[in-house]
Amino acid sequence: MQNTPFRQIRALHDDEFVRVYQAYSDDIADKAVQANSFEAPRAAGIWSAERMTWIKPSAVWMAYRCGWSTMKDKKQALVLALDLSRARFQEMMMGARLAHGGESGKGTCKDAPVVVQWDPEREMFHEAEAKQVLTRGLTDVRSIQIGLRGPSVAMLLDPTFVLRITDVTEDFREAASKLAANDKTAAAAALWRHGAERPMELPAPLRAVLGMDVEAPPAAEVTGRVAVAADADVSTTEASATAAAPTSEAVAAGGKQQLPAGCATLLREAKQN
């Protein structure tokens, strides 16, 4: 990703929608896809708008988090692509708070409806060690992870916000199979069957909120432990159970980075998986 900005939202998108991913259990995913809405699993009592959830536009990051849908747990058995209204997505993101400082991070994360974490981007890599599940982290490019809670999670019930819900599990599994056979070209064709992830052009005020216009630290300063983003649906009670994983920028600073109030709690579930 030479000459790629340090922080950039890359997604399958057009003027009308932006695609993000999340992995779910079979029962939640099946009901959501069939109804094209999370109202069905909510009504069945298996999905809750009270639980914080993390979405991401990077397919490879999603593959890493869910182990290509086959290498982790049953709660991440199926991968869904959520096509969100672009206009409403950008409006929602204006209320975001940064998990790791920055201008917007000066507000508290404790009550923020949207929390943004910038983690090292990941790319497909067939020689990766087992825990990296056919991916590896990049030190010079960041990928956005978007945590939703409260009113932002409730927006997932709105059909004017979530335009389409598509089960893309088989795309992920086929990509993993091709990648394991060292056919990265075929793996990419499978993973991005519906189109490539492209940089999103965003208005300056939103870029400022998301802390996008920052320079990458010198290469020597980003060789620390790669951060682990927040995982699948998790309540804030569960999130407070374990210790947070610092970003590589925090490691470079000696691992003593002070997160905005409430943010450390939200990121503690990162080490559970």
Predicted regions and their residues:
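A structural signal for short, well-ordered beta-strand segments and their strand-loop junctions
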Residues: 20, 81-83, 145-147
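Residues that flank catalytic or metal-binding motifs in active/ligand-binding sites
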Residues: 17, 78, 142
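Glycine-rich, aromatic-bearing surface loops/beta-hairpins
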Residues: 155-233, 251-273
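ADP-ribose/NAD+-binding catalytic cleft of ART/PARP-like enzymes
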Residues: 1-48
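Short helix/loop capping segments that flank catalytic or ligand/cofactor-binding pockets
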Residues: 29-32, 63-65, 92, 156-157
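Long, low-complexity, intrinsically disordered segments enriched in glycines and aromatic residues
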Residues: 87-187
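Intrinsic disorder/low-complexity signal
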Residues: 1, 232-252
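ADP-ribosyltransferase catalytic core
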Residues: 44-124
